[in-house]
Amino acid sequence: MKIDILFLNDEMNGHDEYFDNDLFQEYCETHSFEGKKNQILSVPPSYSKSENLTFIVGLGENKEDINFYDLGTLIGSKINSDAEIKFLNVMEDTNLIIDGILYVQYKFNNYKSEDDSSVNNITFQDLDSSENEIKKNSVFWVRDLINTPALDKSPEEFINKVRELVDSSGIEVEVYDQKWLEENDFGGVLGVGKGSDRPPYFLVGKYNSKAKYQVSLIGKGVLFDTGG
């Protein structure tokens, strides 16, 4: 499906190029669309000069007040199939809008008897969204891990998931076991690990690409925690 997206403020200017003015005005009035902040109106293809489905998105009086990521999620929630999107007027915060559109497509149906876990394939005409896709895939990977119950998320399974993720990426993964943790005084990790019959591990991922700066990211993956 091809979808055009047109952003309009509350003055409703800038649509003449894409619609017959009289028909457009009548349609907006019928559906009480006034270009207010976060208003979204779906306009049928028969009204558009491009003959595509068009989402008219309201920006209100002052677009400085708009959270463009949240606006993207509102737009994305209206899309329920694969779609090729064209922005008729590009905003300076288009990347945030794209992120919102993509992230809201997430589904986690792994434990449903009828699996409908396929994610809508969204592409963007005339825009390079490759970085947005990489971020989306990373976010979805993390969400899948979070949503997977501890019973199916052992440390060993987590290690396998990490290795699958970084395969062919140039990232070297080193895995250190409980004995290594004991020898290197990782008391905190070992202390938390005592709450489970599954032994803890310590993972190191090294990306040794040439770069001006070296960055270390440190985090913990507590796969099961009852709180305290």
Spans of model-derived segments:
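Short amphipathic alpha-helical segment within the helicase RecA-like ATPase core
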Residues: 1-221
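Short acidic (Asp/Glu) and glycine-rich catalytic loops that position anionic groups and cofactors
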Residues: 228
